[in-house]
């Protein structure tokens, strides 16, 4: 059998970031993987994934596969195990996540993810509309990676994100919240939040905030609209989640109510409670 380290960990190494974890893809079936290692946990046999426990941690090992039709805007209804690494990489979301490495065979990069890393580009693998229709959370993931890596999103990929963003209606609050939190905790949260507004995606994330864009404050101490001021505050506060959430919401009542202080606190409380922050 052959195996490759794959995905975000390879991307991070090539960029110069220490990976948080490592994923492995292999030609071995889940049953064969379990027979090869002493301690394994069948964490996702339906999709070909087995957790292999070693002396230095656990690693998700997944059989090469092709995905069938997606259900619930998240998972394929069925998968087909294959013996071709390229077919496995073809199903992945963006090119910089579709790079594999084997110590003997080196880098496998059929979709030029390394080139996109060099040019700092976020680009969907294959048909971008299909990629985002399969799992609309990939739209937020593209924004998050663009924010955290300071990469630009390729034009066709960006157009597909806008065309398919209605699929975010079917994504759970928990998954959306995780991506938003990662954007807020990045080195440039204002970039990510601005992108969510500019593309119209924020109406699926925190629709209550949409009125901040374009709302002028008519105050000599504020030369920006509410959104512009909020983004400036986000840029200057520490990378602490409660602090950055407070910065995001601190003027959210201005564009909706006259009694700003009261309604700002009520809006923030209701949004945070509903979203389980």
Give the location of each predicted region.
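Catalytic cores of the polymerase beta-like nucleotidyltransferase superfamily
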Residues: 1-277
